[in-house]
Regions:
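Flexible loop residues that form catalytic
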Residues: 13, 109, 182, 213-214, ...
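Short aromatic-enriched loop/helix-cap "lid" or pocket-rim segments at secondary-structure transitions
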Residues: 19-22, 117-118, 220-223, 273-277, ...
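Divalent metal-dependent hydrolysis catalytic cores, especially in the metallo-beta-lactamase
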Residues: 75-84, 94-118, 146-154, 175-179
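Alpha-helical scaffold segments that form or flank carboxylate-/histidine-based iron centers
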Residues: 5-12, 88, 153-156, 160
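Short glycine/proline- and charge-enriched loop/turn segments
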Residues: 119-121, 223-233, 344-350
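Active-site-proximal gating segment of KS-fold condensing enzymes and close homologs
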Residues: 123-139
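Mid-to-C-terminal alpha-helical segments outside catalytic/metal-binding sites
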Residues: 2-8, 16-75, 79-103, 134-142, ...
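Catalytic pocket-lining loop regions of alpha/beta-barrel enzymes
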Residues: 127, 140-148, 153, 158-329
Length: 378
């Protein structure tokens, strides 16, 4: 609790240990997935780098820890206590207490990239997802009332993906699906190949959590024209707009009215503009193109979607005015770079102390809406 508000962090991250492959991946696959070198600095699958960062990384740097942001001295100083114990579950809960976070929904770090490539063997992808999901369930078991996981599913094979989704949610208790907005195997998020997954997710009640991550080996907005700095600025909000178009304007949410979708780690300022633009095109019949949905895209967003904001996001009031607090959640991004300079006092405190927002709006963003989004019994 922070300043009298209960808090659910809708987008928090784990840092996977280097040995989870050895402990959780079946023996016949272990030689194909490698995390080697000083501090996890060389990572590959079937000899191919897991991410663009793995292609560029200077493996002579002992401080790298296998993640680009971890090379920052400021990051290492900010999270020194958790780093000393390799971000074990107890350290995450202790840091939640420092921030005033009551409940967290956990996303991957290495898993942002590990099975996201077009040429990945579907059987290996399924094994990696099962290994990660099992490890994450064990991680959350440290405090199952406060820690909740978001699963990986092998999207290279939609049938296997449905099977893993049901296992991860019904057997392991995970509350969402991590899903990048980028094209995978030539498919966008409105591809009919994914419809069985959406049907299963809607039936089970788990949320599709659209979450970008820079430095993927997949094609992403900005990767063909910007350096790492510009690419990170561009890819999150631009890819989320395209994902939102897929779901709201391309008929997916109309076809699956019980499906829930969250757009995370891209801020919320893009949403009012994008809904207005999609609605305008819909009202004018797509500038000569046939309408793809019966209702305006914003109708489906407000029926089935949520976005997230950082605690001090200046455009949150604009979102609330034009879209509504009912569609917004709080996300700290702990322990990634978005919360450096804010942890621990401001990652949540900048919102709980924001008197420009009503008490009701803050309560919705901090607790009521993320609880509904993830169907948390809290």
């Amino acid at each position: 609790m922070r300043d009298g508000f209960k808090v659910i962090d809708a987008d928090r991250h784990v840092l996977e240990p280097s040995d989870w492959f050895e402990k959780y991946l079946p023996a016949r696959f272990r030689g194909r997935v490698k995390v080697e070198g000083p501090n996890q600095s060389r990572r590959s699958i079937d000899g191919q780098p897991i991410s663009d960062a793995d292609k560029m990384r200077d493996t002579s740097k002992q401080e790298d820890f296998g993640f680009t942001f971890a090379a920052s001295k400021r990051w290492r100083e900010t999270f020194a206590d958790a780093l000393a114990v390799k971000f074990e579950p107890a350290s995450n809960v202790r840091d939640m207490d420092r921030e005033g976070v009551d409940v967290s929904v956990l996303f991957p770090t290495l898993g942002l990239h590990i099975m996201w490539r077009d040429d990945l063997d579907p059987e290996l992808s399924a094994a990696i997802c099962r290994a990660y999901n099992t490890w994450l369930a064990d991680y959350c078991s440290y405090d199952p009332k406060r820690l909740h996981g978001v699963c990986l599913i092998p999207l290279q094979d939609p049938a296997r993906a449905v099977e893993e989704l049901r296992y991860a949610s019904e057997k392991l208790g995970h509350v969402g699906i991590f899903w990048r907005p980028n094209k995978l195997c030539g498919r966008t998020l409105s591809s009919p190949n994914y419809f069985p997954i959406y049907e299963a997710a809607a039936d089970i009640g788990v949320t599709v959590c659209v979450h970008e991550g820079a430095r993927t080996v997949l094609q992403q907005a900005g990767s063909d024209r910007y350096s790492e700095f510009g690419r990170h600025i561009a890819c999150h909000p631009l890819e989320q707009r395209l994902a939102c178009l897929n779901f709201c304007a391309d008929g997916v949410l109309e076809k699956f009215p019980k499906l829930k979708v969250a757009y995370l780690e891209s801020g919320c300022g893009w949403v009012p503009f994008w809904l207005e633009r999609m609605d305008e095109h819909w009202e004018h019949e797509g500038h000569g193109q046939a309408k793809t949905t019966k209702e305006k895209p914003s109708y489906y967003f407000k029926r089935q979607c949520w976005a997230s904001c950082e605690a001090g996001e200046d455009l949150a009031p604009v979102f609330i005015e034009h879209v509504g607090a009912d569609y917004l959640t709080i996300a700290t991004d702990y322990p990634h770079s978005d919360c450096i300079g804010k942890f621990p006092d401001r990652t949540v405190g900048d919102l709980t102390r924001n008197d420009h927002l009503s008490t009701e709006a803050r309560r919705k963003i901090l607790w009521d809406k993320p609880a509904r989004l993830y169907q948390l019994e809290v």
